[in-house]
Every structure is written in structure tokens, then in C-alpha cells.
Amino acid sequence: MHLIIPKNYNPVLNLRDTEIAIKLVKDFFETELARALNLTRVSAPIMVTPDSGLNDNLNGIERPVSFDVLETGETAEIVHSLAKWKRQALKTYGFQPGEGLYTDMNAIRRDETTDNIHSIFVDQWDWEKIITPKQRTMETLQATVRAIYLTLRKTEGFVCAHYPHIKPELPDDITFVSSQELEDLYPDLPLKEREYRAVREYGAVFLTGIGGALRSGQMHDGRAPDYDDWSLNGDILLYDPLLDIALEVSSMGIRVDPDALRRQLAIRGCEERAELPFQKALLNGELPQTMGGGIGQSRMCVYLLRKAHVGEVQASLWPQDVQDACRKANIQLL
């Protein structure tokens, strides 16, 4: 059982008020995010076919939930994320540079190891916008991170105004740190402990350079080779004082161009993926240059509503021993 039990935990909101607050948080953040990044909400699939190449392979080992479709005889997969679908959708909808889309993404990750912040059910805002080739820079990435972080701070202010017994925790600014800098600072620490040290010091961190090899030969964390450019991506991490952890609330980046895709497919030894429809279209220059990411809805609610477990803000499945332990600890799972 992977479970942190905060000492003398007492939720700041009861079950019914929590449900009301979840709706308030999601509506406010979504509206502010769309305004900040110039995004239009669109509908999105919950399933794709394996041969489309559109599903997110995550770290490359997670198994998608799949099933056969009676009418067509096809196999369908529940999405892991919409990272690649969004880029294709931007072209389909005719978006222009500076414009983008977002959607409510619901996924099932059957191989997830659950704990206070991990669930087999994933709900996030998936967003993507078109950029120009000249905007494929760290400066563009950092400016977008700051806009998202400002939206998060506005949302925290909104929550605190509605529920005065919830006090603000977020620092005024987010700090940018590279995964290589963390390795240099803490070469003997496990990767997640490095993240913890950074957020414990700064409160809010954007950790860059996820997926590629560090000087030690290790990756800080896995990323599929065919959506983020590993040199232009990162995670938004917050210090959660209730759980005393580094809480990842967003993963985002500037997406691969043809050169980056070829390079990263070769590094991972999966050049055959270049023949899949999405990857082939990208290599042929048929898809726009984009940046995008996912922002965890339930994780944001865990943080802003001062919850101890993601199961307090979403309905999912949990092992019986976790259910029993949560009940004893006054953690009310939905």
C-alpha cells in the first residue's frame, strides 16, 4: 500500500461542499486558461485505433485498455493522453499561429501504481496551440509557463475568497530549474528526491529537460519520443505542505519538429514508428509547429482544496486496504 496519512487530518470542506468547490475550481481555471493562452474548447475522443499512432505511449511500457468493436471488427484503445491527437486537430480545425485548443481529457491508465496523487483514472485539461518555427525556444516555453502559473495563482485567490479558512500557499513566482542542474546538485539522490529538494526550497518549480539522457546517462523521467522535444519541455511542480511532497500538476513542452522526431525515435530504437500515419504526416511537414501540455484537474483540486488524497476529488477504484486506511484517517473517498 502506497499511502501517506497526514497526522490528525481534518478536511477543510465536507463531502458536499467539496463537490461544489470542485466545480467552482474547474470552471474558473478553465475560463482563465483559455483567456491567457487564446484557446478554444473542442470535443475530443476517449478512444483511438492502435494503427493511427495517435495514442500516447507514455514511458513505452504501459498497456492501454483495448476492446474490439462489434460493428467494424476494429480494435480500439482508451487514450492515455491526447498529446498527438491535439496536433492533428489543430490542422483539421484550421487554427492559425497564436491560436489553440483545449479539451477535457479523461483516460484510464490500467498499469498505474496508485497512491495519494496517482489514480488509474486520469482527468486533465489537454491544450495545444500553434507556434511559428522561430518560437521553438526556451523563451517561448518559459513565457507560457508563467502564464499558466499566473492562472493557477488567480485560481488559488478565487478559492481563498470563497473559503476564507483556506489560506494561500503559492509563491509569487515560479522558478525554472533543469533536470541536469538537479543532477549536478544532488548526484547521489533518487530522481524524485531531487524534485522534492527543489520544490521544498522554491515552492513552485518548472523542471526542464524531461526524457533525454543526462550526463550520467540516466533520464530524469521517461517521455515518449514523438510528441515533446526533450530539450524544450518540462513539468510544473508544487510543494504540497499537507502531504510534504513535490506535486506535479502539469507536463508540457514544445513539440517535436521533423528533425527532433527522427533524432528521438533513433535514440529510443523505435524508428519503425515513423511509418505510422501521425508520425509520417509530421515528418512530411504536413502538421503545424505546436506546443502544448496537460494540466491535472484532480491534482489541482487536491492542492487548492487542501486534500490528502486524489480520491477525495474524483471517483475511481482503490485497493481495499487503501479504502480501509482512508476511512480510519478521516479521508473521504468519493
Regions from the language model: what does each represent?
Residues 103-189, 193:
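Extended, charged alpha-beta segments that form solvent-exposed binding/catalytic grooves
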Residues 33-40, 148-159, 308:
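A generic secondary-structure signal for well-formed alpha-helical elements
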Residues 22-25, 29-33, 65-67, 78, ...:
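Generic structural hydrophobic/aromatic packing signal, biased to beta-strands
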Residues 20, 24, 28, 136-143, ...:
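Generic recognition of stable, solvent-exposed alpha-helical segments in well-folded globular domains
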Residues 42, 49-55, 168-177, 319:
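N-terminal pre-domains immediately preceding structured catalytic cores
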Residues 2-118, 126-130:
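Class II aminoacyl-tRNA synthetase-like tRNA-binding/catalytic domains
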Residues 108, 178-334:
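A translation/RNA-centric and nucleic-acid-associated enzymatic feature enriched
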